[in-house]
Amino acid sequence: MTDSLIRIAVAGSGGRMGRQLIQAVQQAPGVVLGAAISRPGSSLIGTDAGELAGVGALGVTVSDSLEKVVDDFDILIDFTRPESTLAYLAFCVEHKKAMVIGTTGFDDAGKDAIRAAGQQIGIVFAANFSVGVNLVLKLLEKAAQVMGDYTDIEIIEAHHRHKVDAPSGTALAMGEAIAGALGRDLKECAVYAREGYTGERDPKSIGFATVRAGDIVGEHTAMFADIGERVEITHKASSRMTFASGAVRAASWLHNHDKGLFDMRDVLNLDQL
């Protein structure tokens, strides 16, 4: 631990989220952009990362590999794709670099790899880095404890047309929060699609519905529906900056933890509520 600035590397720096992350690093106290990574062969290699993100020249050029910038960063923030994240993870374990992982769509093997890596380096792994979403997850646990056993539970999520995984990682996290509060296994009670003659609804199921359209940043609603009333808990994001700022906040928090697997509940100390 040091009083100097925390050096952040941003993976996928040429993407929508990567540029937002660079902006968030520039706006946050106590951190500085140390490196920016893009895929090999990208036309952005060699570009100034600050100019790419619209914050002015920073003197940090986009690189095509972590090996080339290994001495330039302390923590990697990665919102890319599972296969890229796992490759970065192996590198960070080898070189004792901490990671903030916002990538979604991992299979069980990928999640196991992240858990194992948390025994050697510090990792914050979350489906959503928005402070509001993580507060919603806490509220859902409370709602499930009060209403979950006698209501029908449905989760509806909407994202932009370019999102490649469904349901979203946040929707699944909402389902896990609810199922955990009710002592259920989400793998056993989740219903991801309904078509044709489905029969009556299983009262113990948790349903998911997905929308992909336009430029929706992210909207999630959990519904607890009874006869005569229903409670809906909704979060709507209007800018990716909320996720980027949360990820940088997580990186600042993680700098004080040498190893361990954490999520935003830890960063925000939500378990104390």
UniProtKB/Swiss-Prot annotation:
GO MF entries: 4-hydroxy-tetrahydrodipicolinate reductase; NAD binding; NADP binding; oxidoreductase activity, acting on CH or CH2 groups, NAD or NADP as acceptor
GO CC terms, sorted: cytosol
EC number: 1.17.1.8
Pfam families in UniProt: DapB_C, DapB_N
GO BP annotations, alphabetical order: diaminopimelate biosynthetic process; lysine biosynthetic process via diaminopimelate
Binding site for NADP(+): 39
Localization in the cell: Cytoplasm
Keywords, sorted A to Z: Amino-acid biosynthesis, Cytoplasm, Diaminopimelate biosynthesis, Lysine biosynthesis, NAD, NADP, Oxidoreductase
Record: residues binding (S)-2,3,4,5-tetrahydrodipicolinate: 160, 169-170
Pathway of action: Amino-acid biosynthesis; L-lysine biosynthesis via DAP pathway; (S)-tetrahydrodipicolinate from L-aspartate: step 4/4
Main EC class the enzyme belongs to: oxidoreductase
Quaternary data: Homotetramer.
Protein name in UniProt: 4-hydroxy-tetrahydrodipicolinate reductase
